Amino acid sequence: MIIVLSPAKSLDYDTPAHVPSYTQPAFVDDASELIDGLRKLSPQDIATLMDISDPLARLNFQRYADWSPTFTPANAKQAVLAFNGDVYEGFDAKSLSAADLDYAQQHVRVLSGLYGLLRPLDLLQPYRLEMGTRFASARGKDLYAFWGDRITRALNEQLETRSGAARVLINCASTEYFKSVKPKLLAAPVVTPVFEDWKGGRYKIISFHAKRARGLMARYIVENRIAEPAALKDFALEGYAFDAAASNDSTYVYRRRIGE
């Protein structure tokens, strides 16, 4: 089983890592190519391209200038400990044991506009480059064209080491990021957990809650060493429960109703 997550825009480089082990990202050459292009942009170009404020644009202009193809603990941090958004509040890697992080290293992958595909302990230098950004390169008009089938092939290398019901990809990523994966080329079926909350008289996906729940699901898989998707139906954290009637073989729906 491989679980894919989206990255986070919010980053934490202030909290010291609680584990010393780290690995190197696989697509450094590709990231370097993107950085070369990003360095040609002015802060105003970055603000326009990414629809961000001028202070954020200046911050990322400097990040691109400082970025190095050499990753060390002095200039980078393990990805799953650096990301700090809603998904990662749910995953809460800072409280996982070294053994749990080692397990996550084998089973969790993070999709990234700059880095392509990251393992949890891969070193990450700070950046901002969302997968949906229409940043053109020699490979095409946007980042989906830039990455092509590279991410899918990298996932297949991992999936092909699994067998039986354990050869499955659990999609805990957003639509924007999962578009970088080509399901028809995957060497395994895909199961997508969907989290809905009761609001306004019906169940609906509420972005903040759904992001956190996807992180909770990834943590649940890691902590319980879950190998087959059927076991995910027992997930029942923070009030969510599996809804068999709303689910099918490729979409597992979890719902909760808190108050009215």
Curated annotation (Swiss-Prot):
GO terms for biological process: response to hydroperoxide. Pfam families: H2O2_YaaD (PF03883). GO terms for cellular component: cytosol. It comes from the Bacteria. PANTHER family: PEROXIDE STRESS RESISTANCE PROTEIN YAAA, PEROXIDE STRESS RESPONSE PROTEIN YAAA. NCBIfam families: PRK02101.1-1, PRK02101.1-3. Belongs to the UPF0246 family. This is UPF0246 protein Bcep1808_2308. It comes from Burkholderia vietnamiensis (strain G4 / LMG 22486) (Burkholderia cepacia (strain R1808)). The lineage of its organism: Bacteria, Pseudomonadati, Pseudomonadota, Betaproteobacteria, Burkholderiales.
